[in-house]
Regions:
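A beta-strand edge to alpha-helix "cap/lid" segment located at domain peripheries
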Residues: 1-6, 16-19, 37, 51-130
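N-terminal hydrophobic signal/anchor transmembrane helix of membrane proteins
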Residues: 11-15
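A short gly/proline-enriched turn/hairpin at secondary-structure junctions
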Residues: 29, 33-45, 56-60
């Protein structure tokens, strides 16, 4: 369906959206009916839901900086591996968390479904059990 170069461009732009601090910029990478579930939790649905999810991360880590570590793709399926750093807003402790998202892209190369993963126990440990 897609060439790896185009997928890499999308991943770089998605990373820039997270680094902009704008929940709406993050949400624009999703289909209007897209969704994301993190660590098998309840999914956020639609762009408004995606923006709400991103806003939660920005609230917890206002100086969040995201790096795309690697991208793998096969057809319309993408693995986006990332690391974010920043300072937890409540405890003021530094964070460095790695994880990944598994994307299913639609025909317009928007994320239809994302399954996100990171070690929540490690996050809690670094944040000081905030």
């Amino acid at each position: 369906m897609n060439d790896h170069g185009k997928i890499r461009e999308i991943a770089e732009a998605y990373t820039a959206a997270w680094n902009s601090g704008s929940p709406q910029a993050v949400a624009e990478f999703y289909a209007t009916d897209g969704r994301i579930a993190i660590n098998r939790g309840e999914p956020w649905r639609g762009r408004a839901g995606i923006a709400e999810m991103a806003a939660g991360f920005f609230s917890d880590v206002p100086d969040l900086t995201l790096v795309c570590d690697k991208v793998h793709s096969a057809g319309n399926h993408v693995a986006y591996l990332w690391t974010f750093t920043g300072t937890h807003s409540k405890t003021k402790k530094p964070l460095s968390i790695s994880g990944w998202e598994e994307w299913d892209l639609d025909a317009e190369l928007k994320v239809k479904a994302s399954r996100g993963w990171y070690d929540a126990n490690e996050y809690a440990r670094q944040a000081g059990d905030a």
